[in-house]
Design a protein with these regions (language model features):
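Feature captures the catalytic ectodomains and active-site-proximal regions of enzymes
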Residues: 1-148
């Protein structure tokens, strides 16, 4: 499917991210199972929305994490199947774009608000051997090097 791109956009602000994140998962699973895409970029907003609205210490935030974990589990299962059935190598990367204040929101320059993480998990291949401290501007090059 070279030179073909598919973009799925759902309006979480209108319909809520519980619904939209699930629809994004369904579309991503379909893409992985049926379209054979080499790269999928999937964005779930439910955790970010819960952090803004309720802070990171409440039940709403934990529930949002559990929902996104279930979505990621579905994607992981599809990638495991592809690796097993087709001998494919996949790299599942999870990243946040920022942290939150305990009481909710972000936008400041505190260490807590600037905190982020990257998790890279090899499927049908080894995990990448990246440094524990990755500067945000280095991530693109690390990802591209994995395709070499």
């Amino acid at each position: 499917m070279a030179y073909k791109h598919f973009v799925v956009v759902r309006d979480g602000e209108t319909y809520g991210y519980k619904v939209i994140d699930a629809q994004i998962t369904d579309a991503s699973v379909y893409s992985l199972e049926n379209l054979g895409a080499d790269v999928n970029f999937v964005y779930f907003c439910g955790v970010d929305e819960a952090g803004h609205a309720y802070g990171i210490l409440g039940d709403e935030y934990l529930s949002a994490i559990e929902r996104v974990d279930a979505h990621l589990t579905r994607l992981h299962e599809v990638l495991l199947k592809r690796a097993h059935e087709h001998g494919e190598e996949w790299l599942l990367v999870m990243v946040t774009d920022h942290g939150h204040r305990d009481e909710g929101g972000h936008g400041g320059d505190s260490e807590q608000e600037r905190a982020s993480f990257v998790i890279a998990h090899g499927i049908g291949r080894d995990n990448p051997q990246w440094s524990l401290d990755i500067e945000p501007h280095h991530l693109t090059n690390l990802l591209l090097a994995e395709r070499a």
